[in-house]
């Protein structure tokens, strides 16, 4: 009986280690980014095409008001509420303190600068095929917008959905591959 318990504990620990390894965030390093001078005007076009203001600006904001990306909305889902964060260039409450590679990893890999996964309510799954140059340009444009010192709202998904490590397994095994771009295509 004691031997069976030891074997069970070893199997559980081994399975946990495999889960932890398979679900680890895979991110880009700064050296993986292309040598690219940011184009703020292209970043503005990417901002408009990606619809960043539709979630991160105040509801109904128009013109210049839609450029204050203070977050604060609550996305109601069948699984719980998700607070929309401040993505203004504020260095305390927004993303102003993020490096370019932090931003690109959040946008295309769904991984925060701290190494945790974002839930796909943030549509990183749609942006993961974006050209890295476009992501760099978007960061440069966001850095030109007005900062907001609005703190992110508390809340989120209930346990166990708040445990995001399984997203790594979903990414590794279930997230569909991106279609290959035709040769010579400008994505």
Please annotate each region the language model reported.
Residues 1-28:
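N-terminal type II signal-anchor transmembrane helix
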Residues 40, 123, 140, 149-161, ...:
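Interaction-mediating elements
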Residues 41, 45, 59-100, 118-132, ...:
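Gly/Gly-Pro-rich "capping" loops immediately C-terminal to redox-active cysteine motifs
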Residues 16-24, 99-115, 126-152:
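C-terminal capping alpha-helices of c-type cytochrome domains
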Residues 18-36, 57-78:
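Conserved N-terminal glycine/acidic-rich loop preference
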Residues 55-61, 108-109, 123, 143-144, ...:
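Detector for the c-type heme attachment site
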Residues 25-48, 165-187:
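Electrostatic cytochrome c docking/interface patches
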Residues 43, 49-59, 103, 138, ...:
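The canonical Cys-X-X-Cys-His
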């Amino acid at each position: 009986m004691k031997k069976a318990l030891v074997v069970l504990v070893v199997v559980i620990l081994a399975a946990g280690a495999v889960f932890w390894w398979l679900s680890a965030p895979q991110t880009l390093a700064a050296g993986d980014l292309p040598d690219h001078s940011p184009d703020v005007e292209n970043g503005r076009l990417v901002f408009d095409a990606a619809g960043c203001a539709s979630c991160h600006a105040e509801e109904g904001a128009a013109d210049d008001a839609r450029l204050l990306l203070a977050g604060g909305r609550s996305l109601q889902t069948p699984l719980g509420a998700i607070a929309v964060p401040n993505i203004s260039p504020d260095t305390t409450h927004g993303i102003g303190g993020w490096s370019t590679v932090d931003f690109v990893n959040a946008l295309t890999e769904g991984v925060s600068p701290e190494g945790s996964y974002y839930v796909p309510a943030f549509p990183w799954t749609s942006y993961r095929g974006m050209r890295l140059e476009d992501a760099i340009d978007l960061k440069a444009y966001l850095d030109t917008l007005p900062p907001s010192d609005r703190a992110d709202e508390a809340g989120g998904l209930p346990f166990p959905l708040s445990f995001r490590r399984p997203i790594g397994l979903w990414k590794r095994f279930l997230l569909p591959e991106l279609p290959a771009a035709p040769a010579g295509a400008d994505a």
